[in-house]
Amino acid sequence: MGKLHSKHACKRRENPEGDSFVVNGFIAKRAAEEGERYGNNLKDYKNEELKDSQPTLLHCPLQVVLPPEKAEGCESFLQYLSPDDEERDAQKVTKRISLQDLECNVSLAEDNRQEWVFTLYDFDNSGKVTKEDMSSLMHTIYDVVDASVKHSCNSKRRSLRVKLSVTPEPAARRRDATHTERETSHLSQVEPVRSEEHRSADRRQSTHIRGQTEAHEGNHYCVDENTERRNHYLDLAGIENYTSRFDSSSPDADQDPPSRSSHSQSRPHSQEPETHVYQRRSQLMEPCVAPDPRLRTGPQLIRSRSPKGSSRYPGVIPNVTKTSKCHGHHQPISAGQDVYHLTQQSHTHAHTPSGLQHSHSRRIRSRAREQQALTPVKNTNATALVQRHEHHHHHEHHHHHHYHHYHQT
């Protein structure tokens, strides 16, 4: 077999996944030449081969490079084989930072610095930080920062400055006053502002709530007291309560018989003769006649007050309990009927929009008085005028008492 067959026979591959045997063609050619030179003398071949191969092995130094135990600098990855390179590059190695010297701050005397600030808020849920927590946390932060900044060491060298400041939680800031000097100095600047804000906010809130309650109570009390005082003096003067004419659903005006009875008892006796005059004149009035259609107010119904609310005299029960459908007129009145109820109804009729206005001229009043004096009570309009006239004099403090006797027959 020739050289070509033997060379191709050396390149034998059994399995693509492994067990492959490859021989370089240069080594095979050199082995064939040496075999032709020395023949079958294997001893001479081995010795000659070793003598010739010694200088070539010295030119290829072999060295096992192990990874560093802990990378503490950018230049620790480089391994220098020649002594000249090691001496030349040894000057470029920077200072190595030991963790024993590191407590809170690490600073190197260089211009370009990168500062990292970590602020923790009550990480152990107790409001206090011990020295063990600080030291373990500081070492952990330094290791993490050192490992994360290694990839940028080839571009430009920088010094790392790690600063850790521990600040208590705002809730613990008020209840715990035993901190370090740094925390105490920090609290001396922050605490007055926060306490003043909380104090002013609490003061505003309490003042607002207290002011609302006092305003509601004070307004209610003032309104009730002023209304009662005003009603009392109006009743003493013989004038109807102005608010009771329009607000019929008011509990102060409708559903307070004791107060009205007490007011009625305190009235002067000068009004009693007038009450008898009203009763005598009401006995002479005729029953209600069908009124003129022009004086009717379409959908308006006149409500009479309830017997409970309108009774000013204790023991006197009025007979009128239904609404009067005659505009300006009343049902027959008995001797024991409430006179103020009658005057208030007539005053309510006087304010209807279709009837005559409350403020008549003196000419119309005098004409109505002359008509009433000459003829009996026949015209319903005259009756309405007389009643309105009487009610008007009742509101004007009874300046015209002599007219009341003038109408009697």
Curated annotation (Swiss-Prot):
Organism superkingdom: Eukaryota
Annotated segments matching region Disordered: 160-224, 243-315, 346-366, 388-409
Tissue expression: Expressed ubiquitously until 1 dpf, when expression becomes confined to the anterior CNS, with slight expression in the developing tail.
Location(s) in or outside the cell: Cell membrane; Cytoplasm
Basic and acidic residues bias spans: 171-185, 193-224
Bias-annotated ranges (Basic residues): 389-409
UniProt keyword list: Calcium, Cell membrane, Cytoplasm, Lipoprotein, Membrane, Metal-binding, Myristate, Wnt signaling pathway
Primary localization: membrane
Compositional bias ranges of the Low complexity kind: 247-268
EF-hand domain ranges (all copies): 109-144
Binding site for Ca(2+): 122, 124, 126, 128, 133
InterPro entries: EF-hand-dom_pair, EF_Hand_1_Ca_BS, EF_hand_dom, Nkd-like
Calcium in keyword set: yes
GO-annotated biological processes: Kupffer's vesicle development; negative regulation of canonical Wnt signaling pathway; negative regulation of Wnt signaling pathway; Spemann organizer formation; Wnt signaling pathway
Any one GO molecular function term: calcium ion binding
Residues carrying lipid (N-myristoyl glycine): 2
Cellular component aspect of the GO annotation: cytoplasm; plasma membrane
Similarity comment: Belongs to the NKD family.
General function of this protein: Cell autonomous antagonist of both the canonical and non-canonical Wnt signaling pathways.
Protein name (database record): Protein naked cuticle homolog 2
Native organism: Danio rerio
